[in-house]
Structures are given as structure tokens and as C-alpha cells.
Amino acid sequence: QQILKSLENVDLDKELPGVQVCVIEQQDRVEALFNERYPEGLKPEDVVYHAQTAEELLMINYTSGTTSEPKGVMIPQRAIWSNMAFAKEVLPQLGGGQKVLSMLPTAHLYGMSFELLYEFIVGIHITLLNRALSPALILKALSSIKPDLVVVVPMLIEKIVRKGILPKYNSPVIKVLRKIPGVRNIVLGKFRDGLMQALGGNLYEVIIGGAGLNSEVEQVLKDIKFPYTVGYGM
């Protein structure tokens, strides 16, 4: 077994921030190292916590982004803090004991922020899909897990709406029924309930992002009063 002896700041490159290097020692030297550092024993004043600042580097996110050229993106504390504050503001109903199905890559800050970090902070149970994603696999997982929150890219919602809703929604009979006061709300409610069931039946909200949502599909979601938020372009 090994333990951490010390942390030392090492300047690897004058253009890069200092890097802390861990020095490792064997377990049998633990007591000697402890006594060397704290000859009078560990006191409360010896415990010093690092004071974080908003501009401090939190992570280097290695991604291709929109340029297709892989690069390391330096993400400060501020970027993640602001996203977590935003999530708390717009998703106040979510909390401990609820469930989310994580499908987006965590190398992307959209997936990391709203499918992993926020859920971890408020105590939501996270189920990760570790297989190649397909609409059939995703729908099966949604039916089994019945998540409270779904965060997806537009492609999934667009496929479900186009294949499962639009053919009936745009049929001559339904078009007539949608124009009749009183009947319209009942018909639209049936479509909303069907889409909710396809996504697990237990949804608080669906967050759609990563790309633009098709305007025809979005209009249907608005008409049936489906609980969704478009996060693309924030």
C-alpha cells in the first residue's frame, strides 16, 4: 500500500498553469512521515482547506467541439457553478430518490452538467447506458427505468414524433377533431399521454439540446403541451 507524502507545485511550461505532483511513499513509512510533519501532533490549525475561486481551473475538457480538431478546453469553476445554479432554478422539483437515464457523452459539458453533475449534487439515481445507442435500445431502457428527467439530443424526439405521432396527428380525421372546441384538448391530451408513455411514463421534464430541434416537431410538442425545454443555443 502507498500513501501521499506531499504535494508540490511544478511549472512544466511557463505558458501553462502550475501542476501539482503527488509524491508517493510506502505504507510502512506513514508514522515516520506523520511525526516528521506534525512533531507535536495534529492540531485544528494544521487543517487548512483550499479556498476556491470562481476563475480557478476546474477541468481540462478534451473535445473536438465544433471545429473537428481535438483540443483541451480549460473550464473554470465559474462555468460549472453557473450551470448548476441554472439547473437548480429551472428544475426545482428534482431531488433525492428520483431517476435519470444518462445517454449523452460526459466529455460534452451538456451531458456532464445536466445528466451527471447536477444529479449527483441533489441525489438523483443515475443509470448509465454503456452500449451503442439506438432508438430501440433507448426506448426499452426508458420503459424499464421510468426516469423523472430525460436529457436527449433532438434526433431521438424527432424520430419518436415522426414515426409514432405525426402520421395520426396529420390524418384528415384528427385534423378535423383538433379544430373542434372542447374536443381539441382531449385529442391533444391523448397524444401527450402517448409520448409520455413512450419515454417511460414518469416524466417531470425532457431537456433537448446539442443541436437545433426541427420546427415541425417542436410545434407538435407545443400543441400537445408536452413538458420540454430546448437547451440548444443557451
Question: Which residue ranges define each predicted feature?
Answer:
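Conserved S/T- and glycine-rich ATP-binding loop of Class I adenylate-forming
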Residues: L57, T63-T66, V100, V150, ...
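Alpha-helix/helix-capping structural signal
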Residues: Q2, R78, M155-E158, A211-G212
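Conserved AMP-binding/adenylation subdomain of ANL enzymes
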Residues: W81-K99, T106-D193, N202, D223, ...
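Conserved pre-ATP/AMP-binding loop-to-beta segment of ANL
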Residues: D28-A32, Y38-Y62, E69, Q93-K99
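Conserved A3 ("GATE") glycine/threonine-rich loop of ANL adenylate-forming enzymes
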Residues: M155, G209-V217, T229-M234
